[in-house]
């Protein structure tokens, strides 16, 4: 499987936003139409879209559900793979998204509180459709929209969720997220080496060199948000630099 650069479309209040370290009210970027943003990434070469419902993650409501459905309707016919996270707290939440054509659901807090949920979803829908998000701050996993810290490390939880049937892991280094200060590859590399399922990296990408650095950890891909929206580089440039290195 080739390394993939995946643009993030984070939604809050019906808009596409980028937060600093996930903090509500810290919007660096706010664009009116997430559907247009998604289509723009597709036009630039995106094969996968990473959609995050921040209202779902922070407050538990599904106000962005109609937008997600519209993105699916516009992008799926073009063969685009869509993964969605944010506020998926139950089997029913995940099933609803998978039923409308989402390819992969991303669970975080719900998985940490009830690891058996991953097994149930994997048994029902197949592990390739189930991703667990591990968000690390100061070496420990954060939950509930990054507002609380757990006692567990990413390596501990990654191994546990692989056993439960997760098909992939999204690993975010919150210490770097949204700051545009560059990446620390070590935590990603440690997790990649601890599990056999694909790990998608996230957090802190600022330059094209950061993308190459994360590729070299053995990660399967990288989610990029702030750097693209701040025009540090284009998605096409990011895709091309990976192609050049393959």
From Swiss-Prot:
One of its GO terms (biological process) is L-tryptophan biosynthetic process. CDD domains: HisA. The active site is at 10 (proton acceptor), 135 (proton donor). Its EC number is 5.3.1.16. It holds the Pfam family His_biosynth. Keywords: Amino-acid biosynthesis, Cytoplasm, Histidine biosynthesis, Isomerase. It catalyses: 1-(5-phospho-beta-D-ribosyl)-5-[(5-phospho-beta-D-ribosylamino)methylideneamino]imidazole-4-carboxamide = 5-[(5-phospho-1-deoxy-D-ribulos-1-ylimino)methylamino]-1-(5-phospho-beta-D-ribosyl)imidazole-4-carboxamide. It is found in: Cytoplasm. The keyword Ribonucleoprotein does not apply. GO terms for molecular function: 1-(5-phosphoribosyl)-5-[(5-phosphoribosylamino)methylideneamino]imidazole-4-carboxamide isomerase activity. Pathway: Amino-acid biosynthesis; L-histidine biosynthesis; L-histidine from 5-phospho-alpha-D-ribose 1-diphosphate: step 4/9. InterPro entries: Aldolase_TIM, His_biosynth, HisA_bact_arch, Isoase_HisA-like, Isoase_HisA-like_bact, RibuloseP-bd_barrel. GO terms for cellular component: cytoplasm. Belongs to the HisA/HisF family. HAMAP family: HisA (MF_01014). This is 1-(5-phosphoribosyl)-5-[(5-phosphoribosylamino)methylideneamino] imidazole-4-carboxamide isomerase. It comes from Methanococcoides burtonii (strain DSM 6242 / NBRC 107633 / OCM 468 / ACE-M). The gene is hisA.
């Amino acid at each position: 499987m080739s390394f993939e650069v995946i643009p993030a479309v984070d939604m809050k209040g019906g808009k596409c936003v980028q937060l600093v370290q996930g903090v509500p009210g810290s919007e660096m970027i706010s664009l009116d139409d997430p559907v247009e943003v998604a289509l723009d990434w597709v036009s630039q070469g995106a094969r996968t879209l990473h959609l995050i419902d921040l209202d779902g993650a922070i407050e538990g409501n599904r106000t962005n559900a109609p937008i997600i459905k519209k993105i699916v309707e516009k992008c799926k016919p073009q063969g685009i793979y869509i993964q969605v996270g944010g506020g998926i707290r139950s089997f029913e939440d995940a099933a609803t998204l998978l039923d409308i054509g989402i390819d992969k659901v991303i669970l975080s807090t719900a998985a940490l509180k009830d690891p058996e949920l991953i097994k149930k979803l994997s048994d029902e829908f197949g592990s390739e459709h189930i991703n667990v998000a591990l968000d690390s701050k100061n070496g420990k996993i954060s939950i509930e929209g990054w507002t609380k810290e757990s006692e567990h490390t990413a390596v501990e939880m990654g191994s546990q969720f692989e056993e439960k049937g997760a098909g992939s892991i999204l690993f975010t280094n919150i210490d770097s997220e949204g700051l545009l200060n560059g990446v620390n590859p070590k935590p990603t590399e440690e997790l990649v080496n601890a599990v056999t399922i694909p790990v998608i990296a996230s957090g802190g990408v600022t330059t094209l060199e950061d993308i190459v650095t994360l590729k070299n950890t053995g990660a399967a891909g990288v989610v990029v948000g702030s750097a693209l929206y701040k025009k540090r580089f284009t998605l096409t440039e990011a895709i091309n630099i990976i192609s050049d290195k393959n």
